[in-house]
Amino acid sequence: MTEIPSIMLIGCGRSKLQEQSPARDLYTGSLFRARRSLAEEMGCRWFVISAKHGLLYPDRVIAPYDVTIDGLSVLDRAAWFPVVTSQLIDAIEDPGCFYDDRDLRRVTIEIHAGESYASRLVETLRAAGFTAFHPVANLGQGKQMEYYAVRRRQVGYSRIGAGRT
C-alpha cells in the first residue's frame, strides 16, 4: 500500500499557457501534469512551488512568467527557501486550514520538483520541524514519469483494496 503524504509540493514548469490561469492549469508540461495527477489521485493537499511566487495555492490565478530558481541572484535564491517554508507554515496555521494537526513533526511533505528546488528545500523544511523528502531525487525525466505511472497505479490498487474492507 502507498503511504499518502500530508502535502505535496510540485515544481512549476517551463511550459505554460500564454494567458492568466489558475496555477493548477498554467503549467502544461508532461512532468507537471504527471505530478499534479498523482497528487489529485492521492487526495492529498498540494501546492505549486515557483521561483517567482514561492508557494502557490493551485487555484491562485497568475500570469505566465519566465523565472527559474537557477536564474535568481545568489541572495534571492538563499532567501527563497525560508520564504517558501514560512508560507507553508502560514498555510497550515491558518484557522480555516485544511489540516487539523498543527504539529509540524506529523506533517509529511513530498517534494516533486527539480534538484535545484528540492534538495535545499528538503533541508529547510526539516530544520523547521517537518518530515520532508524528495522521492524522485536524482532521477531523470523519463524515470520520473515511470515513477509517477507506477505510483498512480499503486494508489488505485490501494483504493480498491480499501473499498473491500
Show which residues each predicted segment covers:
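Peripheral peptide segments
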Residues: M1-T165
